[in-house]
Amino acid sequence: MRLVQLSRHSIAFPSPEGALREPNGLLALGGDLSPARLLMAYQHGIFPWFSPGDPILWWSPDPRAVLWPEEFHLSRSMKRFHNTSPYRVTLNYAFDRVIDGCTNHRDEGTWITRGIEEAYRRLHELGHAHSIEVWRDQELVGGMYGVSQGALFCGESMFSRKENASKTALLVFCAEFIHHGGKLIDCQVLNSHTASLGAIEIPRCDYLEHLSRLRQQPLVSRFWVPRTLFLPRK
């Protein structure tokens, strides 16, 4: 297996089955972050992930981390918090602010480069990338964003400035996603946070089968229209 150099003149990707085992899932480098190339990548289970100063790197890890939304793990403490939550949750109200929050909230640095920000803003303008916002009064305290593929949602990043804000974003999104025909959330690579919320690892081949099937299944009409998803308990 060898790393493939992408051409700027073609948006085609090599098969994910050719990805390196170490580092796990590294498939290709180069190309660009145009909407057409990004959408082609997501349609084939591939995503960009690289640090500032590095070339664009494309990944398709094996195994793949996913969350079946009905399997979201609601801990006792989170259930108590949610029952008296002070938060309001919205959909697609403030995409730019959410991606800024994901970029700037990590003290150790971030993989979300200026180029990544601009690329996903373009995807949002085209109706493919979406945000979930969590508010305390008028303050944005958390959120997440990702890319839609029919009944599958590819989560990209989340942030939290207040207690349980990012968990609230995912909890409320899972409930709405299920209600409107959503089936699976792609978490890309498992970490302790997503594992605590119910994410698991499945073989890449299984993920690609789910992706091929689910991206052909539309959600209920107008699901992504900007709106309020959750109001705080009184």
From Swiss-Prot:
One of its GO terms (cellular component) is cytoplasm. It is found in: Cytoplasm. Belongs to the L/F-transferase family. PANTHER family: LEUCYL/PHENYLALANYL-TRNA--PROTEIN TRANSFERASE, LEUCYL_PHENYLALANYL-TRNA--PROTEIN TRANSFERASE. It is an enzyme of class 2 (transferase). It comes from the Bacteria. Pfam families: Leu_Phe_trans (PF03588). The lineage of its organism: Bacteria, Pseudomonadati, Pseudomonadota, Gammaproteobacteria, Enterobacterales. One of its GO terms (molecular function) is leucyl-tRNA--protein transferase activity. It comes from Salmonella arizonae (strain ATCC BAA-731 / CDC346-86 / RSK2980). The gene is aat. Keywords: Acyltransferase, Cytoplasm, Transferase. Functions in the N-end rule pathway of protein degradation where it conjugates Leu, Phe and, less efficiently, Met from aminoacyl-tRNAs to the N-termini of proteins containing an N-terminal arginine or lysine. The keyword Protein transport does not apply. GO terms for biological process: protein catabolic process. Its EC number is 2.3.2.6. Gene3D superfamilies: Leucyl/phenylalanyl-tRNA-protein transferase, C-terminal domain (3.40.630.70), Leucyl/phenylalanyl-tRNA-protein transferase, N-terminal domain (3.30.70.3550). SUPFAM superfamilies: Acyl-CoA N-acyltransferases (Nat). Its main location: cytoplasm. InterPro entries: Acyl_CoA_acyltransferase, Leu/Phe-tRNA_Trfase, Leu/Phe-tRNA_Trfase_C, Leu/Phe-tRNA_Trfase_N. This is Leucyl/phenylalanyl-tRNA--protein transferase. It catalyses: N-terminal L-lysyl-[protein] + L-leucyl-tRNA(Leu) = N-terminal L-leucyl-L-lysyl-[protein] + tRNA(Leu) + H(+); N-terminal L-arginyl-[protein] + L-leucyl-tRNA(Leu) = N-terminal L-leucyl-L-arginyl-[protein] + tRNA(Leu) + H(+); L-phenylalanyl-tRNA(Phe) + an N-terminal L-alpha-aminoacyl-[protein] = an N-terminal L-phenylalanyl-L-alpha-aminoacyl-[protein] + tRNA(Phe).
